[in-house]
Amino acid sequence: MNTESKRKRRANARPWVLVMALLVVGLAYSVVVPPSSSAETEMTQQIEEGKAIFDVSCSSCHGLNGEGLSAGPSLIGVGAASVDFQMGTGRMPASRGEAQIPAREVIYSQEQIDAVSAYVASFGPGPDIPKSSQYEPEGLNAEQIARGGALFRANCSACHGIVGGGGAMPEGKHAPALGDTENVHIYEAVRT
């Protein structure tokens, strides 16, 4: 009888031993594997939201994976800044270099634009959306402003006009006026 009761105790103890072993393994795993940060989780969620918008609104021209189709160029490596500019201004370049497509009405919220930008940025490296300290004029001295003016005259005024008023260009293209364009979009257009 003594042997029989020992067997019963062992049989009853097996589930508890298994539970304890699983608990030890789980605790060890949680110590060894670093937890994902809330920033990573938010970025993953933002990319998923961007993919949902992209699949419905962009993939018919740019392909399901941004690889490009005959109606739209590849977006691999264009970066978040390019997407923010295109979607934030409604200005998408023509895919084959013909006359410029007129600007469309901006129909997405900044949150949606940020989500699609994050999704497209996941295709490959490219320019990020700049921080406001990179494009806001606050804190610039007279020398920096003069340098910016010289850069504009050398690189931008031929199309946008000496005062940024825009104008007609060859082959049916048109350079838009820059007066109402947000600083971030001008910065992104220059970088992308």
Show which residues each predicted segment covers.
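N-terminal export/targeting leaders of redox proteins
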Residues: M1-Q46
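Sequence context of c-type cytochrome heme-c attachment sites
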Residues: N2, V32-T41, G63, R91-E105
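Electrostatic cytochrome c docking/interface patches
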Residues: S30-A52, L69, P125-L151, E171
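Extracytoplasmic low-complexity, Pro/Thr/Ser/Ala/Gly-rich segments
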Residues: S38-P73, G77-F85, G90
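Sequence/structural segment immediately N-terminal to covalent heme-attachment motifs in c-type
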Residues: T44-S60, D84, N141-V163, Y187-E188
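Detector for the c-type heme attachment site
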Residues: D55, C61-E67, G79-A80, G88, ...
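Extracytoplasmic electron-transfer domains, predominantly the class I c-type cytochrome c fold
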Residues: I76-G124, G172-T192
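Short, intrinsically disordered, charge-balanced linker/junction segments flanking boundaries
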Residues: P130-S132, P137, H160, M169-G172, ...
